[in-house]
């Protein structure tokens, strides 16, 4: 289908016989009924064949290290970490993340949201599941193999980032090579992404007059990157398409094969321009147009006659923008941050300037307002009107403290304007600086340095920051409002010195919510590393739980602890008491953790005696619950040790005389017999009266009532043990040479019944009941990761990038030389949107003057280029005019 046929079918007009271009219609667009989008899931996967036509690269290659720069400082969001199932769900699609709203990706380590948030799609290359298909008329196309939701990330547009001179050279070069399809995308005003020969699958996304995708630019680190996103919900099997938007640059119409009901039959040219001005959807929404359809209708109702200079700016001026709301603030700030066209920036600033809602002004400040306005001020500092707009907006913004102003460094951009030659600019700048000078910098509580080897609490300070804009509920009356409450002791840290922490770098937040069994610590340089209980270390954040050693069954573990408690109590020397007149001395033996199995090194005779006493407890396993048995065993230990020390029976704490061992066995038997009887009686009463509370002692106190010994030398309470006159230090004999068996954790004032071994038993029991995670001591950091040698692919990419840099430098050098030679002669130059017409003969030529170029066409769709001198000669010797033609689908003005 030829362009003429398409036009004839579109508006019912015939093509003139003389071959002149048809007069394109300016009828208002109408919403046509649209059926379900066609599916292409029946077409075979042609990805392998498509990848043979170009070189696949994973990331952009830059013509210089400064190309693709975002011109923005690192901006962090105020979201808090949201860990679920080992994944950080902060900064999601439905969150109120200010970075996501302003099209900035969070960078791990620099943001409050923690590592691995959901606003890192470019960095993680979270592309959609797509495949390449072979279409009937459009060549290769891109198909989604899974359902997509609105705003889902499809693919990053990757290629070679080149400057404008290289871009112009390549358009001519590709045409000479017979390349039919160019893949240029405008990254900035003078930078382009060329995916013609090097790119990824995103280059196969075709054009459509009814697109289901859109192209957007995001700030990722210090670079500006371009991605393709879903406009609406897309079914698996649909072709992914977006609007190429070439008409803004004066391209001649090309046949369009999208097949949509609203297809105008051409890509570019007057047809699309007069039906609707195709600004990016995000820019349209930021300008205050309701949606694409209303925008389409509004601009189509313009008068039929349009002067040659009328363009997007004139159309926008004819449309009344809607009132600014909270969502509109997000879109305005996001578009303003990347805006390089003055007339769009003026419109966006006018919307901010006109708002009087204090809540919306607070929203502007929160959405990185000071940083974005500073960047816009630096971009358009030569335009007095734009500067006055920005200074007025800055003056209107609410200000309580100077913190955000200082953090954004906007003062550095305003201060030079105070001495500007323009009187209004100087007065506005001085007024603003004077207001800022009256503000105080609020003291900020520094972030707490967490114990990285222990559990990491939540970030309550950042949570407070995130919720500061929310309305607080009414607080109840404070009963102590009129009472002066004394404050605590002063800290040695200066509390009101605003500059105390000014020179310190903000500490990075330690990783939180690690998989089970993993812990975090820092090395000497402050770098985090991870370790588990086995001593394994690594630099990378673990994604799976640590491999745990097989655990002993609960029953066996409890039995072992009950037996060990008795063994430890009988083999340890209790803490010696000091008399009132004796000053406790510091132990000269360094504190070391006592060994739990030290009884194994004792003589066999002693081990047998310990086992005899242990066997008594073992006999009652089937008669008492495990927890009660453990508690009774502790009661036996406490009473026996207290009684022996009170009556001076201890001659050697590491051995028990046979006579005393017999008494211990008898007492233990009697104790447990009474305990079993009491427990059985209690259970019977409980069974007969299930709803009536028993008047006796609870099950946990059976030991207290059962422990009524027959002899006075055994009835020993804790109070009596503490007040006994016989508990002097002289009676607590210690054998020389047994220091290795002493418990260094014993305190001089601890009673025998509360020896550290008993305390440790209680801790062990609590550990068995609650199973808290014990934190092992951190091992030494792992060795630094070795610098792996670059792979062959890495070396190849580096060589290609260096070659691209040389190509850009050479093109820029030739451009500068041509400008110096020509000195700006001539009248034909690029005006920012369209090329001026240039005179030509039968064969039009490309004529460059200064920074402007005119693209000629020889009548057969081939671009022609020559030197400036030859172009001038051809132009001077012939007459006529010719519009430019561009073979690629997206350009930016010079």
From Swiss-Prot:
Its main location: nucleus. Residues 462-475, 792-830 have a biased composition (Basic and acidic residues). It catalyses: L-lysyl(36)-[histone H3] + 3 S-adenosyl-L-methionine = N(6),N(6),N(6)-trimethyl-L-lysyl(36)-[histone H3] + 3 S-adenosyl-L-homocysteine + 3 H(+). The keyword S-adenosyl-L-methionine applies. It is found in: Nucleus; Chromosome. Residues 128-245 form the SET domain. Residues 1-44, 447-494, 572-604, 678-830 are annotated as: Disordered. PROSITE patterns: AWS, POST_SET, SAM_MT43_SET2_1, SET, WW_DOMAIN_1, WW_DOMAIN_2. Its EC number is 2.1.1.359. GO terms for molecular function: histone H3K36 trimethyltransferase activity. Residues 72-126 form the AWS domain. One of its GO terms (biological process) is methylation. Residues 512-544 form the WW domain. Pfam families: AWS, Med26, SET, SRI, WW. Residues 774-788 have a biased composition (Pro residues). Histone methyltransferase that trimethylates histone H3 'Lys-36' forming H3K36me3. Involved in transcription elongation as well as in transcription repression. The AWS and SET domains are necessary for transcription repression. This is Histone-lysine N-methyltransferase, H3 lysine-36 specific. It comes from Chaetomium globosum (strain ATCC 6205 / CBS 148.51 / DSM 1962 / NBRC 6347 / NRRL 1970) (Soil fungus). The gene is SET2.
